[in-house]
């Protein structure tokens, strides 16, 4: 029964490390014996590559275009099994500049539901592009598919801006679809006072920073080999960070309706933590950078 499945979604600004974070977290959940399916909802189709050790999985939309209709597909053509038995699907998207990428998500989820893909699962994880919360990309939220949203962010201004926008999208459908915000995952960029900053943002958004993932080069080393850190470097401290995050998500009961803030409030927060200074500080920083310049 779909009603008994924990349906979670990872949203976040493009380039924030959302797909990497989500796959490493799913690997941690799978290690605990959870039965999981990943539904990639990003046109880049990179939501399952670390689980499958592949460049990119063939997407539902791509195969449907080849066959003429999604009804002509078989489930085992688009649903593959990856690391620790995790089921993997990519919805895909249209050619750049043509059509609505969000439509691929709608098509994919409907196809999966109609063909029994949700049977015998504990978790379904949607990995969703989060720069633009348009109708299509908001579909897992709008239709009540994803009940728990985790926003991957960092202490950088645009990542926080995207997180606030996603919170606004969650709020819009919280009462009609029952979706809730599970927390912010800080995927560190080594910004000054990053932990304090994201904790403060979480408080303003009426949520929690569920985990702080430190920056470590082993993540890139694993990615180059198309593996999660948990598989590539099982005993590495970074692998344990993802295991801790997975455990926190499994045990999370703090699911809230977010309270998004205005752009002015976001800028005030950045000023408060010294990330975005006033004009005087800005000019001082430029002068300092100029002084450090080396003429060759």
Swiss-Prot record:
Cofactor note (record): Binds 1 [4Fe-4S] cluster per dimer.
HAMAP family: NifH (MF_00533)
Complexes and interactors: Homodimer.
NCBIfam families assigned: nifH (TIGR01287)
Organism: Trichormus variabilis (strain ATCC 29413 / PCC 7937)
Required co-factors: [4Fe-4S] cluster
UniProt PTM: The reversible ADP-ribosylation of Arg-103 inactivates the nitrogenase reductase and regulates nitrogenase activity.
Record-linked Gene3D superfamilies: P-loop containing nucleotide triphosphate hydrolases
Pfam families: Fer4_NifH
Name this protein carries in UniProt: Nitrogenase iron protein 2
Residue sites binding ATP per the record: 12-19
Recorded family membership: Belongs to the NifH/BchL/ChlL family.
Enzyme Commission designation: 1.18.6.1
Binding site residues for [4Fe-4S] cluster: 100, 134
Top-level taxon of origin: Bacteria
Catalytic activity: N2 + 8 reduced [2Fe-2S]-[ferredoxin] + 16 ATP + 16 H2O = H2 + 8 oxidized [2Fe-2S]-[ferredoxin] + 2 NH4(+) + 16 ADP + 16 phosphate + 6 H(+)
Native organism taxonomy: Bacteria, Bacillati, Cyanobacteriota, Cyanophyceae, Nostocales
């Amino acid at each position: 029964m779909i009603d008994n499945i924990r349906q979670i979604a990872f949203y976040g600004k493009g380039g924030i490390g959302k797909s990497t974070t989500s796959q490493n977290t799913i690997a941690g959940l799978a290690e605990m014996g959870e039965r999981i399916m990943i539904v990639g909802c990003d046109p880049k189709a990179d939501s399952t590559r670390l689980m499958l050790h592949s460049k990119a999985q063939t997407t539902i939309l791509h195969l449907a275009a080849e066959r003429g209709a999604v009804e002509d597909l078989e489930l085992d053509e688009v649903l593959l099994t990856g690391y620790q038995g995790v089921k993997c699907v990519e919805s895909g998207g249209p050619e750049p500049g043509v059509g609505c990428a969000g439509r691929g998500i709608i098509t994919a989820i409907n196809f999966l539901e109609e063909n029994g893909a949700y049977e015998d699962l504990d978790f379904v994880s949607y990995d969703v592009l989060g720069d633009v919360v348009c109708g299509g990309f908001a579909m897992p939220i709008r239709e009540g598919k994803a009940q728990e949203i985790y926003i991957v962010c960092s202490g950088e201004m645009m990542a926080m801006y995207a997180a606030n926008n996603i919170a606004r999208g969650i709020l819009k459908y919280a009462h009609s679809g029952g979706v809730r915000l599970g927390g912010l995952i800080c995927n560190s960029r080594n910004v000054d006072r990053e932990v304090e900053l994201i904790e403060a943002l979480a408080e303003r958004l009426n949520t929690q920073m569920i985990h702080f993932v430190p920056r470590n080069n082993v993540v890139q080393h694993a990615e180059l080999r198309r593996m999660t850190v948990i598989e590539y470097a099982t005993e590495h401290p970074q692998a344990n960070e993802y295991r801790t995050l997975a455990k926190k998500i499994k045990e999370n009961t703090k699911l809230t309706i977010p309270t998004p803030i205005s752009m002015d409030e976001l800028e005030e927060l950045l000023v408060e933590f010294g990330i975005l200074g006033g004009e005087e500080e800005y000019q001082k920083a430029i002068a300092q950078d100029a002084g450090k310049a080396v003429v060759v």
